[in-house]
Amino acid sequence: MKMSDQFLAYLLLRLTMGVNFTFHAIPRFLKGAGGFRDKMVADFSQTPLPPFLVYAFGTVLSYIELIIGILLTIGLFTRYTLVAASLLMMALMVGTSFQQKWDVVASQLIYSVIFFILVWTQQSNFYSVDRIMLGRE
């Protein structure tokens, strides 16, 4: 069967986001996730966010990104993963807005638009574990 351009486009965009999220996390684990978390706490020290919340978020963020990245890459639980990724982007945007890093907020908004597109066009998620193994269309 010839791969349709629509299915190919969806696959490539989903893979791009999956690889992106996976490789946001992997270098942090290689360097030590605690270092990333501690840097986050320091970076947010001048914001009204409580340090214990930043500490907790910084502790789990790399794991969440890795899980989202892997699930997007293989196309498993794609809809739920995209919702989780969108919620994560909202949380990141709140923190980044407190830091007033508007260039980063703009980048996070672009991620959110991409996740919107992936959710909106999910009927094109043909090449995925969801469809192949679980019979989802």
Model-predicted regions and their roles:
Residues 34-44:
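Peri-membrane helix termini and adjoining interfacial loops of integral membrane proteins
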